[in-house]
């Protein structure tokens, strides 16, 4: 079994690669690819860590690899994690990333369609709302689209909600669960605090707490960008969240039961936008089942109605990028 990280030399990619080297099951293969010439060195660096995961790196500028061609890294892979692209800077929204990152992800997914069409694809690169539909259209054009094998990684939203709720309510963070659905941008993330649990029991929030927590979860990415004063975005927490997700899906492909939130194609006629973050059961072939979202309260329903047209516009933007 093999995982390939595309964008492995970036701020998220390096840390993600390290975490996968530490956490993947013994005997797993880990391929790292980036256009940066340092990528093989990153693989050498983490290969010195004593785990039974085999890491090898490929660079787009490596003479043994066709220029900017990740084909060798993708050969026989089971799971592709895409982190390639530019990161957010102060004043930038995820939408500002679109013009650059859309082209990068489109090119990479075209290679996935060609080299490993049966692989599962997890997209970390922002804007996830738009890049996942781009990937879907690219795979459709290639005749290999399988909605059970494509997902946007929204784990960071769930991780942040869990952390912020545990801090506010002084609960053991390991016992806290908070559903987070919707999209993966400040205007489309929807935490369902009415369903938040600690130690298996529903938590009580005042309306002020709900509104404050909701806004903090939605804008947590901006909080990090501003706190780093121009020195980067949420690379470390994103890498850790991406590693959690990748590891869970990898184990599901090996037969372990796994439920995670992910931005995936919704069931037709469900009333949700075409792509939406749902609770998902993963299995041997990728997505096995999209699980139902419990009824929303009035505040959450209002939020849902507000985000729906924004998310639908994001999705349409992605589709038109591939099919003008």
From Swiss-Prot:
Q: What class of enzyme is it?
A: oxidoreductase
Keywords in alphabetical order, please. Answer: NAD, Oxidoreductase, Tricarboxylic acid cycle
In the UniProt record, does the keyword Acetylation occur?
no
According to its UniProt record, the EC number is 1.1.1.37
Entry's CDD domains?
MDH_glyoxysomal_mitochondrial
Q: Please give the GO cellular component terms listed in this UniProt entry.
A: cytoplasm
Active site (record annotation): 184
- Where does the chain bind substrate? 88, 94, 126, 160
Q: What does this protein do?
A: Catalyzes the reversible oxidation of malate to oxaloacetate.
Q: How does it assemble?
A: Homodimer.
According to its UniProt record, which protein family does this protein belong to?
Belongs to the LDH/MDH superfamily. MDH type 1 family.
The name under which this protein is listed is Malate dehydrogenase
Q: What is the organism field in this record?
A: Haemophilus ducreyi (strain 35000HP / ATCC 700724)
């Amino acid at each position: 079994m093999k995982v390939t990280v595309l964008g492995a030399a970036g701020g998220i990619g390096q840390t993600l690669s390290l975490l996968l080297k530490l956490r993947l099951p013994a005997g797993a293969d880990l391929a790292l690819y980036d256009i940066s010439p340092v990528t093989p060195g990153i693989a050498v660096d983490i290969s010195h860590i004593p785990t039974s995961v085999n890491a090898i790196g490929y660079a787009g500028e490596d003479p043994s690899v066709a220029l900017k061609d990740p084909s060798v890294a993708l050969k026989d892979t089971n799971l592709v994690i895409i982190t390639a692209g530019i990161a957010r800077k102060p004043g930038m929204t995820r939408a500002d990333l679109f013009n650059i990152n859309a082209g990068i992800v489109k090119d990479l997914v075209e290679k996935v369609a060609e080299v490993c069409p049966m692989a599962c694809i997890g997209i970390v690169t922002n804007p996830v709302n738009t890049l996942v539909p781009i990937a879907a259209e690219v795979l459709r054009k290639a005749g290999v689209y399988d909605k059970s094998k494509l997902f946007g990684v929204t784990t960071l939203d769930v991780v942040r909600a869990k952390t912020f709720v545990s801090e506010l309510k002084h609960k053991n963070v390991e016992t806290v669960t908070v559903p987070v659905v919707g999209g993966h941008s400040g205007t489309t993330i929807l935490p369902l605090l009415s369903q938040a649990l600690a130690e298996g029991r529903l938590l009580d929030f005042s309306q002020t707490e709900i509104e404050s927590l909701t806004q903090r979860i939605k804008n947590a990415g901006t909080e990090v960008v501003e706190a780093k004063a121009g020195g980067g975005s949420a690379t470390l927490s994103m890498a850790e969240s991406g590693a959690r997700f990748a590891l869970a899906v990898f184990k599901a492909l090996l037969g372990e039961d796994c439920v995670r939130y992910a931005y995936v194609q919704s069931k037709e006629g469900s009333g949700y936008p075409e792509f939406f973050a749902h609770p998902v059961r993963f299995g041997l072939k990728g997505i096995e089942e999209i699980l139902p979202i419990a009824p929303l309260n009035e505040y959450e329903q209002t939020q849902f109605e507000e985000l729906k047209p924004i998310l639908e516009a994001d999705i349409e933007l992605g589709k038109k990028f591939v099919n003008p």
